[in-house]
Amino acid sequence: MSIVILDFGSQFTRLITRRFRELGAYSVILPGTASLERIQQENPQGIVLSGGPSSVYDEGAPRPAPGVLDLNVPILGVCYGMQYLAHEAGGDVKRAGKREYGKADLTEYGGRLFEGIQGEFVAWMSHSDSVTQLPQGYQVVARTEHTPVTAIENNDTRRYGVQFHPEVVHTPKGGQMLANFLDICGVTRDWNAEHIVDELIEGVRAQVGDTGRVLLGISGGVDSSTLALLLAKAVGERLTAVFIDHGLLRLGEREQVEAALTPLGVNLVTVDAKDEFLGQLAGVSDPEQKRKIIGREFIRAFERETAKLGDFEFLAQGTLYPDVIESAGGEGAANIKSHHNVGGLPDDVQFKLVEPFRTLFKDEVREIARLLGLPDHIRMRHPFPGPGLAIRCLGEVTAEKVDILQRVDDIFISGLREFGLYDGCSQALAVLTPIQSVGVMGDERTYSYTAALRAVTTDDFMTAEWARLPYDFLATMSNRIVNQVHEINRVVYDITGKPPATIEWE
């Protein structure tokens, strides 16, 4: 049983799902036009109609399939969803006299959605249409200065609507509203990592059977490492995890992965392909070309190794729920594409996919990793790009430059951990620039590389702020780097947000 969120195009739809799961309720996102049969497959205890950019009067405006609003479950409409509920029930929706974007104070509020909430209520508004005439059976339960109909409810039909976003952090008490909706739906809040680990293991066993062999391409990141542990528990030696060392890893990463996974029962095969990757990258400076070469070489190395290992019926992938959401078009699951941890696979490779994490978010995978015993230094590690240090080494990639960058990166990341700053950053990295400049070391002139340090904070990686690291810490890092990595004589810190910059430099 679940809460089904019908997505009508809001940028915040994913947050609704996350908030419900944080409250202990399983929830799924389906296209706003999903069929009644598809929705009923989820056995919903409640439905949320998301916001979106459309107007209910637009030609071709998205709307739920026939019969959805007749289901005998509570329904919550958010922004466009509220307008649609009101419109379909016979109310009026018109272009607002004054648009509301950003924070607004509710001048009054009440009703079941607001039960237990007291004091000031700040809401995040984003709408150009408003409900101007209530449908029969509804009552207004919240207002702002400029929006007299900010929240509505019909307790007889259990239909509720809000003209703001309770799911965003800018609505501080929105979480309590969503919790109240779960109570209205009668949801048992038992969605947690402990509850689902056994289900995931049993699901893999049911799919693979008693004899099926499973192949996993492992990157060393939290998703594939956690998946390796889960599969090892599910099928034991019938799992083979292939870890390709392309020579573009962080310092000591190969050894860390082997030390973390092998003692926990993962049948791990490590492939040393450094020479092949660096050989193909020689003379290449364009970042997109570097990515393509690395993806191609991953395929080749993976094919060479798997040919030695015998036949596999199943290929496991660490696909997460955001991948599924982003890949689903209006037709729903039929348009979902595969996401390959190994950089892509040939079209003619015939595997059955095993994707236990396809309904999970990253934070849920991290919690499963904790339960399965994955060491914290891997479980809580910052994101690392598939092409590795190749896209943090600007210009041509050589073994010498990778060695320099590995040492700089290790000093920076180790320093963040030492000073207690690592967990406060969402991602931190070092970049080796092709810029060389004059410096003085001792009494001698130097002409060496410039290293750039970057750290950001973000909730979703769609936008990011540069991390305000202490000056004393940055000074310490600069001093350590130029003294321990003699090929570097200048260190800079990137203070650009996203946008306009991306988090990675290439």
UniProtKB/Swiss-Prot annotation:
SUPFAM superfamilies: Adenine nucleotide alpha hydrolases-like (SSF52402), Class I glutamine amidotransferase-like (SSF52317), GMP synthetase C-terminal dimerisation domain (SSF54810). The keyword Transferase does not apply. GO terms for molecular function: ATP binding; GMP synthase activity. It catalyses: XMP + L-glutamine + ATP + H2O = GMP + L-glutamate + AMP + diphosphate + 2 H(+). CDD domains: GATase1_GMP_Synthase, GMP_synthase_C. Residues 191-381 form the GMPS ATP-PPase domain. The active site is at residues 79, 165, 167. ATP binds at residues 219-225. Its EC number is 6.3.5.2. HAMAP family: GMP_synthase. NCBIfam families: guaA_Cterm (TIGR00884), guaA_Nterm (TIGR00888), PRK00074.1 (NF000848). Catalyzes the synthesis of GMP from XMP. This is GMP synthase [glutamine-hydrolyzing]. It comes from Deinococcus radiodurans (strain ATCC 13939 / DSM 20539 / JCM 16871 / CCUG 27074 / LMG 4051 / NBRC 15346 / NCIMB 9279 / VKM B-1422 / R1).
